[in-house]
């Protein structure tokens, strides 16, 4: 919990968390990207829980300034950003942020569902394993920025996610 509080204090981008958490889901890790000079310009929160279609599932929610590459790296995609043409069609999913819906587009990937959009002038990535866990986004997923003041959330923590670098 202390490490998450440090990330929240230092982050220049949102630290997103679905809230309320989907039923049975736990926070399973977090990380940031940046340096002492520029600060934390990317954040990722890992979650684990039941796949709506059966079996276990993992999810990473990443926020980053353009050009950081944390989302693409954690999604196993080339480059730093989602790439050209990712938003060339109707959105495939939405998230709810502060009573507004933000569109997300599916980015081609193998074995996982990768959704990308833009919220608060930052890239927002949702990466879900296996790809069938993407059904969690059939309805808009409500997200909260853990940097927002006056939040007393009792977060349930689980085992560390293997989806984040050690």
Task: State the predicted function of each range.
Residues 1-12:
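N-terminal cysteine/histidine-rich coordination modules
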Residues 10-14, 73-75, 121:
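Glycine-centered secondary-structure boundary/capping sites
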Residues 11-18, 46-47:
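Intrinsically disordered, low-complexity boundary segments flanking structured domains
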Residues 17-28:
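Proline-anchored loop/turn motifs at beta-strand termini and strand-loop-strand connectors
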Residues 22-24, 52-54, 118-123:
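Short, solvent-exposed coil/turn segments at beta-strand boundaries
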Residues 26-106:
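Short, solvent-exposed recognition patches
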């Amino acid at each position: 919990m202390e490490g998450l509080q440090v990330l929240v204090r230092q982050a220049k981008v949102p630290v997103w968390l679905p809230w309320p958490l989907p039923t049975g889901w736990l926070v399973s890790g977090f990380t940031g990207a940046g340096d002492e000079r520029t600060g934390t310009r990317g954040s990722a929160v890992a979650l684990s829980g039941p796949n709506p279609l059966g079996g276990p599932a993992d999810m990473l929610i990443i926020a980053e300034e353009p050009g950081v590459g944390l989302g693409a790296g954690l999604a196993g995609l080339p480059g730093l950003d989602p790439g050209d043409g990712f938003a060339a069609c109707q959105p495939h999913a939405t998230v709810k942020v502060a009573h507004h819906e933000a569109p997300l587009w599916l980015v081609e990937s193998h074995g996982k569902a990768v959704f990308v959009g833009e919220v608060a002038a930052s890239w927002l990535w949702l990466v879900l394993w296996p790809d069938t866990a993407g059904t969690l986004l059939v309805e808009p997923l409500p997200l909260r920025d853990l940097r927002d003041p006056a939040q007393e959330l009792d977060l349930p923590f689980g085992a560390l996610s293997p989806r984040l670098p050690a």
